[in-house]
């Protein structure tokens, strides 16, 4: 089961943006490669149409953490597998604003999808200020009323409620 495994309440703020989840992506992909850096090692596993092609492999030692998922949608299931880099990039940016401090990277490895230097299209988002950074982003193309963003935060761990306003 792949649902709701965000720490620090992240699942509650990303609920409308996370899509169908890795279980569905895995089942509908001709190939999925997962790399997880945790517990001091790099762990990898590959899948074909939702079925592991080998057991989880324990790789090299690392002090890093993070997860990389690559997938190839099955052309036998989908009429089109052409994705818009701009749409996905916007979605990743929105998720990064909502999950303060989370790093989200997107790289387009399709032939012909390159920048002016001939490199694959790639973006990396991390917003340490969360929704305050989102308001700053919105203000970057508009006139602002105040020099600094007015922001309030409150949390009641017992009631399992948190509030962020900017």
Over which residues does each language-model region extend?
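Generic, well-ordered alpha-helical scaffold segments in large soluble proteins
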Residues: 27-31, 91, 95, 137
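GHKL (Bergerat-fold) ATPase N-terminal catalytic module, capturing the glycine-rich phosphate-binding loop
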Residues: 1-73, 78-79
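ATP-binding catalytic core of ATPases
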Residues: 62-112
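Generic recognition of stable, solvent-exposed alpha-helical segments in well-folded globular domains
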Residues: 19-23, 27, 83, 87-90, ...
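Proteins with a high burden of low-complexity, intrinsically disordered sequence enriched in S/T/G/P/A and R
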Residues: 1-4, 70, 80-81, 154-166
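Broad gene-expression machinery/nucleic-acid interaction feature
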Residues: 29-31, 42, 66-68, 89, ...
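GHKL/Histidine-kinase-like ATPase module
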Residues: 86, 93-94, 101, 105-166
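Conserved phosphate/pyrophosphate-binding and hydrolysis machinery centered on Walker-type P-loop NTPases
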Residues: 11-18, 78-85, 120-128
